[in-house]
UniProtKB/Swiss-Prot annotation:
UniProt family annotation: Belongs to the pseudouridine synthase TruB family. Type 1 subfamily.
The keyword tRNA processing is assigned to this record: yes
Superkingdom, natural source: Bacteria
Phylogenetic lineage: Bacteria, Pseudomonadati, Pseudomonadota, Gammaproteobacteria, Legionellales
Keyword tRNA processing: yes
Class of enzymatic activity (EC top level): isomerase
GO molecular function ontology, one term from the record: tRNA pseudouridine(55) synthase activity
Name recorded for this polypeptide: tRNA pseudouridine synthase B
Xref: Pfam families: TruB-C_2 (PF09157), TruB_C_2 (PF16198), TruB_N (PF01509)
Gene Ontology terms: biological process: mRNA pseudouridine synthesis; tRNA pseudouridine synthesis
Keywords assigned by UniProt, alphabetized: Isomerase, tRNA processing
Catalytic-site annotation from UniProt: D47
Length: 303
């Protein structure tokens, strides 16, 4: 079976192992077609060059996409010293080349230390960020450069896995909005050798460290029942939120848009995972003053 014509709602999260050479949106559309999903969205683009985890949200799961967009990510990347490109990766044109450079293992380690923690990063012109509604990469292809402001990012892990004097392999865990190819380029600049990224693989999105990814080929070869079994429950993406169990009457009230009294001890403004008495996921609520809760994003069914 290759595709399905779904007569029912498809709700859940698929952890897709995106192939190289495909845009995130193209991967989303192929997966959406395979599942026959009426509504779908991805949670953080991967460049065509990149592979790895691309969480896709189907149906009611699209209501929690923002939490996955905001989640930390972990990557494995390979950089090459000695040259820079206009895109900071191997798909671009070489704009700088240096033949005579020497970088020791100790120098590389010392340089990586400078990029750990909270740092500033200037996004590449070859990014999906927009200027007056136009993606920067489109402007870059027209030879237009726009001034970009440095942004705060956090590199929580930066580990050197391999280094042969030219190519270096890194494991990087970072906050949202981090451009790994820019990080690789900045490392090369600090070493005064230049560098560009040759490989990028997303290992996981926070919350899914131990979950399996599936390729499009694997999914296409599966029967429908097995394919649907690959979907992850919506609430697994928000396990970092405090869970709150509501009574049947409270579930009814909050679905009607009413504020309910539920002494959770949560901080005002804190998002909460809401469940019914039978542990069915209701959606996301928000804590108010005095422990009250209001609906923030409810699913339209009980899982």
């Amino acid at each position: 079976m290759t595709t399905i014509e779904s007569q029912c709602s498809i709700d859940g999260i698929l952890l897709l192992n995106k192939p190289q050479g495909m845009t995130s949106n193209a991967a989303l559309q192929k997966a959406k077609h395979l599942f026959g999903a009426k509504k779908a969205g991805h949670t953080g683009s991967l460049d065509p060059l990149a592979t790895g985890m691309l969480p896709l949200c189907f149906g009611e799961a699209t209501k929690i996409c923002q939490y996955l967009l905001n989640a930390d990510k972990s990557y494995e990347t390979i950089g090459r010293l000695g040259s820079k490109t206009n895109t900071a990766d191997c798909t671009g044109e070489v704009i700088f080349c240096i033949e005579n450079y020497t970088v020791s293992h100790e120098e590389m380690i010392a340089t990586l230390e400078k990029y750990k923690g909270k740092i500033k990063q200037i996004p590449s012109m070859f990014s999906a960020l927009k200027h007056k509604g136009t993606p920067l990469y489109r402007l870059a292809r027209e030879g237009i450069e726009i001034e970009r402001k440095a942004r705060d990012i956090v590199i929580s892990q930066l580990k050197l896995e391999q280094f042969d004097g030219e190519c270096f392999t890194l494991t990087v865990s970072c906050s949202k909005g981090t451009y790994i190819r820019n990080l690789v380029e900045d490392i090369g600049d600090t070493l005064k050798a230049g560098a560009h990224m040759t490989k990028l693989h997303r290992l996981y999105t926070a919350g899914f460290e131990n979950n399996r990814m599936y390729t499009l080929d694997e999914l296409q070869d599966m029967p429908l029942s097995q394919r649907l079994a690959c979907l992850i429950p919506i609430d697994q993406a928000i396990q970092h939120l405090t869970p709150v169990i509501l009574s049947d009457s409270e579930v009814t009230a909050i679905r009607q848009g009413k504020v309910i009294s539920n002494k959770t001890g949560a901080v005002e403004g804190e998002d909460l995972r809401l469940y019914g008495e039978q542990s069915q996921f209701i959606g996301i609520g928000q804590a108010l003053i005095h422990g009250d809760i209001k609906a923030k994003r409810l699913v339209s069914f009980a899982l």
